[in-house]
Every structure is written in C-alpha cells, then in structure tokens.
C-alpha cells in the first residue's frame, strides 16, 4: 500500500504569474532560468521551448541591459509560458520590460538601489498588475547588512527581505513573493523557516549556486526537501550548472518523491545484483529515455529478481519481476503475462504506453461526467 503525503502546506496569499497561480492552494510550481545570451533571441526562444517541454511552469530570463530588454520583448511575443525578468542594478530595465509584457519582475534588494527607485518599479507593477519577487541572495546582501553581520547569516537574509517587504507594505503593494537563497543548505533552510513565520506571501525556494548536475541535485534535493516537508514553499527553482532542462527534471522528481505533484512515470527500480535475470540498468535507461513524453502519472516497478520483485510489482500500475526463463509482468497489482528476455524493453514500452493511455482516457471520462 502506498502512503499518502503527510505534508500540510503553509498558508500563503496567492498571486498570478501570467496565467499560473503561485501560492494559496495552487500546486507548487517549477521554474528554471535560461542561460543563453538574452540578446540572442533565436537561441533564447529555443531554450525556453525546451524548458517548457520538460514541464516547467515558469521561466526566468536575465535582463542585464536595455538591449537585452528589447530582446526580451521580442522573446515574449514568441513564447507562451509565463516569463520572469531577472533585474539587477538598473531599475529602468524593470520599467522597460514591464511595458514589453513581462509576467513577473525579480528585483535584488542588494543592488536595486534607493527606495525612490523601488517605488518607481512598484508603481509600474501596480499599473500593469505585474507581481514582483523580492529575491534576496547571500552573495549580494546590502553593504550595511554585510557590515552589521560580518558575513551572510540566516538573520541577515531575513532582515534584507523584511526591509523590502516593509517598503512594499508602505505603498500598499501586496502582489509579490519572496526568496532568501544561499548556497549553504543550512543557512538557506534556516532563513526560509524564519521568514515563513513572519510573512504571508508566497515563498520561492532555491539553493542558489548549488553546483553541477550531481552535487547540485543532491544539495537542492536535501535543502528543498527539508523545507517542502515542513510545508514551506510555493514555487521552486533547482539551480544547476547544467542544461536548464535538467533543473526542471530534478524539480519534478523532488515534488514527485514527496507526493506534492504528479507527472509522468514514477520508476521504482532495484540497483541490480548477481541475482538479476535481465540487465536492470540498461532496461531502466532505455525506458526512461523512451517514455519521457508520457505525462500521465503512472507507477512502474522494474525489479531484477523474485526476492522483492513480486512484492513491489503488486503495488504499482505496471510491475516487472525478473524470472527464469521468462519475466513476470503485473498490471494493477495482478499477474498479467510473461515477457521473454528478447525484446523485453519493446514489450514493456508498449504495455506502459497502453496503460498510460487507458488511465488518461478514464480520467478524461470522469472529468467529462462531473
């Protein structure tokens, strides 16, 4: 029997980033960020489309100059996914992309400048109903906070965030979310936990500059997992020095592992040993690659022998338990058929696609009857 998620999410206000709800009772959204030159419109559009295909809900784009702002306007016209403009130093860039159709403005309290500049951004955002993200980062805290604390700390991150929350409150602007990111897992977790008790706005989670594909995945999974288990977090971004598509995949895997969202196939597979009756690792790699396009939630077990195979296979939609001379396949917990070693992956792929299509059709039929 599969356990239900025990997580009770923190109550937060809901904002809209384009047509995507963030906070409140909305699903936790997944973001990524382009790493192309924004002025290269073709490359940036192509990457955004790949990120969207991978399952992202929102994409952030760095806008470091006015030339990039104009390019952002061209990009905005060519993609359908909500776009966040990442703004540093020059508040005038925020004003320009607001006019060009941005769905959310990320500003950094550590470098956006005086309150007068923030007010200009707030006024523009209010006029056009654009949400703002107050994006605090341990690597770019305000100079006075660096002096006060000596080094980045959870308290410093939270103080920076609250300072700018107070500014937005003063001007009666509530259409915003907040992040307090650090590359240190414990610092980020402590900061988010403290901030979560002091504001009601949505929280954007991330472990900043987490590292490469393997190390960054581990750090992000540990840090974000701790917070999400606490019920903290309304949108997440996994920061990896890797293809942004990988960020989306990891983000989905984190949410799926905590049963906070479902999409595509949840594979359960043994690490393989000398008892395996087929090549588990090769089979898994093939199936993951071939079935990436399936979005219907489905649990699939691939177990190499009869020790744990039947037990795992009974708990999933499609289960494979290795055997000799044939491998036993379960469908919806019931033994269904046996597959030869030859063409094992082809046979499994065909069966999984059939089950996914049937499940999708049933869900559509239920919705149609409601």
From Swiss-Prot:
Cofactor note: Binds 1 [4Fe-4S] cluster.
Catalysed conversion reaction: (2E)-4-hydroxy-3-methylbut-2-enyl diphosphate + oxidized [flavodoxin] + H2O + 2 H(+) = 2-C-methyl-D-erythritol 2,4-cyclic diphosphate + reduced [flavodoxin]
SUPFAM superfamilies: Dihydropteroate synthetase-like (SSF51717), Nitrite and sulphite reductase 4Fe-4S domain-like (SSF56014)
Binding residue positions for [4Fe-4S] cluster: 270, 273, 305, 312
Gene Ontology terms describing biological process: isopentenyl diphosphate biosynthetic process, methylerythritol 4-phosphate pathway; terpenoid biosynthetic process
Disulfide bonds: none
UniProt keyword annotation of Kinase present: no
EC number(s) on file: 1.17.7.3
UniProt pathway: Isoprenoid biosynthesis; isopentenyl diphosphate biosynthesis via DXP pathway; isopentenyl diphosphate from 1-deoxy-D-xylulose 5-phosphate: step 5/6
Entry keyword Metal-binding: yes
InterPro entries xrefs: Dihydropteroate_synth-like_sf, IspG_bac, IspG_bac-typ, NO2/SO3_Rdtase_4Fe4S_sf
Cofactor: [4Fe-4S] cluster
MF terms (GO), sorted A to Z: 4 iron, 4 sulfur cluster binding; 4-hydroxy-3-methylbut-2-en-1-yl diphosphate synthase activity (ferredoxin); 4-hydroxy-3-methylbut-2-enyl-diphosphate synthase activity (flavodoxin); iron ion binding
Keywords for this protein: 4Fe-4S, Iron, Iron-sulfur, Isoprene biosynthesis, Metal-binding, Oxidoreductase
One matching Pfam family: GcpE
Family the UniProt entry places it in: Belongs to the IspG family.
HAMAP family: IspG
Function: Converts 2C-methyl-D-erythritol 2,4-cyclodiphosphate (ME-2,4cPP) into 1-hydroxy-2-methyl-2-(E)-butenyl 4-diphosphate.
Entry protein name: 4-hydroxy-3-methylbut-2-en-1-yl diphosphate synthase (flavodoxin)
Organism: Saccharophagus degradans (strain 2-40 / ATCC 43961 / DSM 17024)
